[in-house]
Each structure stands twice: as C-alpha cells, then as structure tokens.
Amino acid sequence: MDITAILHMHAELSLTAVFILMFLLDLFLPATQRHWLRPMACILLTIQLLANLWPEEVTLFGGMYHSTPMASVLKSILTIGTILVFLQADTWLKREDTRHKQGEFYILTLSTLLGMYFMVSAGHFLLFFLGLELATVPMACLVAFDKYKGHSAEAGAKFILSALFSSGIFLYGISMIYGTAGTLYFEDIPAGLTGTPLQVLALVFFFSGLAFKLSLVPFHLWTADTYQGAPTTVSAYLSVISKGAAAFALMIILMKVFGPMTEQWSEILCIIIVATITIANLFAIRQNNLKRFMAFSSISQAGYIMLAVLAGTPQDMASLVYYIVVYIAANLAVFGVISTIEQHTHGKIEREDYNGLYKTNPKLTMVMTLALFSLAGIPPFAGFFSKFFVFMAAFHSGYYLIVFIALVNTIISLYYYLLIVKAMFITPNEDPIGNFRTATPMRISLLVCVAGIFVLGIISGVYQLLSDTAIL
C-alpha cells in the first residue's frame, strides 16, 4: 500500500496534530501564560472541525479502516460536543487546585476523542477495540481528575473496574466471533454467521461489552456513583460524547456485522430497552442529588437511543444521529447550569438548593427549564421531534408494544423533570442561591446549546439532511 494513502485519514491525523500541539503548549508555556490553553484548545479543535467538513469515502489497510460521509458527520458531532465541554470547563479549570492541570485535561479529552474517531471508522474488530480502549483509559483519568477528593477517587476506581470487566467480556465475544467466522473484518464476518448457539453467545458478549459503555440496564450499577464523584464537566462529557460514540458504533456494527442475526439481537434489545427506560425512570424519581439525577436521566435516554438501533435499517441511522445531536445540546445545557452553580456556591447540587432559583438567577433558570423540557420531549422543543422520529422508526419496523411502553415512560419522566422546574419557579427558599455573573465561555456554550434546542426543532431539513447522508 502507498504510504501516502494514510493521508486520507485526515480527520484522525488532524486531531493527532491538535493533540501534539496542545501537548507542546502544556510543556513549554510558562505558568503566567497557561490561561491561553483553553482558547487555544477551542480554536485548534474548531480549525480541525472546519478542515474536515468535506468528507470522502475512504477504505484503507485492506478494509481495516473505512470512513464514509456518515462517519465524518458523526465525528463532527462528537467534535462540536467536545468544544462545548471545553468551554464549560473554563471556570472549573481556573480553580487553584486544578489550574496547574489544565493541559492534562485537554490532552486526556483529545485522546478519548481520537479513540472515538477510530471506533466510528473501524472496519475490523482489532482497530475497533484499540479505539475503544483509547477512548476508555484516558476517561478513567478524567473521572478521577480530582483525585484528592474521596468521591472522585472512588468514582475513578469504579469506572476502571467497570471498564476492565466490559473490555474482558467484549474481547471474549470477539474471540468467539473469530472462532466461528474465521475473520475479524466487518465485511467478511456476515458470510460466516449462521446463528449457531456459539455465535449467539458471541453476540451477547459483544453487546454486553458495549452496554457497559452505554450504561444500559443491567450494566448500569455504578453509573450514578461515577457521575456523582467525577467533576461535573467530566460527567457531562461522559454522558453525551462518550455515550454518543458508543451508540454510533453499536448501530454500525449491528447493521454491518450482525445483519444475518437481526432476529436474535432485536429480541435482546427489546428486553434491554424496556428494562433500561423503566428502571431508570423509577430511580430518577427518588434522586435529590442533581448529578445522580442526571445519571439516571442519561440511562433512560440511552434506552430511547436504542429504539433507533432496534429499528434496524441504515435509513434509521438518521433518527439515531438526530436524537443524539439534540440530546447533546440539552444535556450539556443542564450540566452547564449545574456546573456554574456548583462553582459559585462551593458545591450546591441538591434539588432543594435550587428552590427559588428563578428569583435570583432567571437566565440560568430559563436555560435549565428549556433543556429539561427538551429532555422530557415537550413540544415545540427539539427533544419532542427527536423522540418522535425515534418512535416512528421503531413503529414502522413493527415494534408497537415497545413504542407504547416507551411512550408511557415518557409520560412518567415528565414528573421528575418537572419536579426540578417546580423547585426553581415555585418552591420558596429561605436561603436561596445568590445572584452571580456567569463566565463568558460558559455563556457561549449555554447559548449554543439553547440555540440548538430551538433551531433543531424548528428546521426539519436537518433530519432530512441526515437521512440523505445515512449510509453505513
């Protein structure tokens, strides 16, 4: 193979260049100039994003690497979400105990993003696993970023144990696939799949490994502890970017690799979806800590995301992508408000702390309310349309009962989302959170998220554009 063919991996190469530049800046910038790290990270990542807006279909290394226009769209979505997270991290990283670790945060985050790029463009299970681990190992460091705080260290330990267990299960499933199909190339595996018991077991192990990354029930047990203990900005990144990449990868592999076994994995997925949405909703109602609340909300949203996967056609990839784009905007808006209030109040993240928030911080309250309405699926916000497209995709595929159960759970979710809205607007507070000015980078991030919640709901052409690009 001509070595110049590697240059066609321009998304990965340009992101690697950003990684190296950030590493050098972190290494050589004096302490008095380290405040330039965040703007440089955002600028470099934006340039990288713009440089990859003209995608092409590329197959390299005999099919081990395969990038399509849709894969480029997915990478762009993950990159935009990462830029928003960088903006939200600004105030947190300026604290005295984290100021000296700014460079580490950006380098670790870029490492996880590079791993997700490889997951999305993998055409071979070996490359996919390398991307998965590249996305997971730095994430463990991010979860334990505040390592001298007990909750963060505990969250990091639990994340590492979950990651090790899920990786082991995933590898075991891959080994079974290789033993029965004789190859690990995505294009060649379907020809060797006949639905034997060993292949079904391999499918179960593969799915279980990725289910940990998506926090699907029953693989969710330490998710709430991880979200609560991790820094809020890291929890935001974990809930949307990491989960979005895993969902993209899962659908691509189920369509490309396990297409001949659709009957088997669709049955598994039906059970997982019902359990995930229902159990997560029941636990979310009981939560007072907003980070634990958002953890169970994230688990529930993962169940809705799986509805698009269940639909099982490449065309339904559009509903999955649209849902995740909207989910990124709404979830980052909520976590942005939580992070802002947490930084200015030295850790207030309980629901009762938000009582009467509208009287002292009306703008943050409105951002939080709009985002929660979108997550709940209330029209005319984008969350309503994202749920509608996902439900219609599953309905047209004949999963009527699953759609009905999901609709019932959507109604249940209104209760716990509106509990927070009620607290902010109606419930009195003798010691309310004081008024404060939100940092400019956070305001930019929240403005983009709110604009996304409105614009993605109003402009239906976004969904049509994704439908036209949805080629796995």
Swiss-Prot record:
Q: Which InterPro entries match?
A: NADH-Q_OxRdtase_suN/2 (IPR010096), ND/Mrp_TM (IPR001750)
State the UniProt keywords alphabetically: Cell inner membrane, Cell membrane, Membrane, NAD, Quinone, Translocase, Transmembrane, Transmembrane helix, Transport
Asked whether the keyword Ribonucleoprotein is assigned, the reply is no
Entry EC number(s): 7.1.1.-
The biological processes this protein is annotated with in GO are: ATP synthesis coupled electron transport
Q: How does it assemble?
A: NDH-1 is composed of 14 different subunits. Subunits NuoA, H, J, K, L, M, N constitute the membrane sector of the complex.
NCBIfam families found in the cross-reference section? NDH_I_N
Protein name listed in UniProt: NADH-quinone oxidoreductase subunit N
Query: Which organism encodes this protein?
Result: Phocaeicola vulgatus (strain ATCC 8482 / DSM 1447 / JCM 5826 / CCUG 4940 / NBRC 14291 / NCTC 11154) (Bacteroides vulgatus)
